[in-house]
Amino acid sequence: MAWIDETPEHAAEGVLKEAYARIGRALGRVIPFYRAYSVSPQHLHAHLDFYEKIGKLGVLSKRRKELIAVAVSAENGCRDCTALHAGFLRAHRVDEAVVAALAADPGRALADGHVTGAEAVILGYALKLTRTPHAMRAEDVQALRDAGLTEPEVFEVALLTAYFNYTNRVGEGLGVEPE
C-alpha cells in the first residue's frame, strides 16, 4: 500500500480498468507501483505507452535492459522494482548468483566480478549516472564505445538508466512497497 489513495483492481472503472487490463496482460497482475498511479489514469496510460515502447524498441538485448533495471533500482533502494526486474532476469536465465548480487548491492557485484565485459561497463555507467549525474563526462560515453557499444546502444543505456531512476523516484516518493 502506498502513501496515497489507490484504487484496487476490483473497483477500477473506465480508463483505469483499461490500464489495469493492459498491465495484467503484460505482467500477469497489477503490481503496487501501477496501483499508485490509479489516482491519475491518464498518466498511467502514458507511462505504460512509454514503458512498452522502450521495452520493445531499440537495439539493446532484453538481458541488458533488465541488468540496468535491477542495478539502478537496487542502487536506489527501490525494492518493488528490484524484485520485479530480478524476476525478469531470472526468466532470461541469468545465473541466480549474479541476480542476487546485483539486487543486494550492484556496486559490490561489479567489484566482485559478478558482471564482466561490456555488461560491467554498461552497469558502471548506469551506476555513475544514478549516483552522480553531474559528474558524467565524455570519457564515460567513450568507455561504452570502447566496450563495443554502438551510438544507438549508448543512447539506450542512458535512456534506460534515466527511466528507471524516474520510476524508482515516483515509487519511493509515494511509499510504494512490494507485495
Predicted regions and their residues:
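Hydrophobic alpha-helical segments
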Residues: 1-179
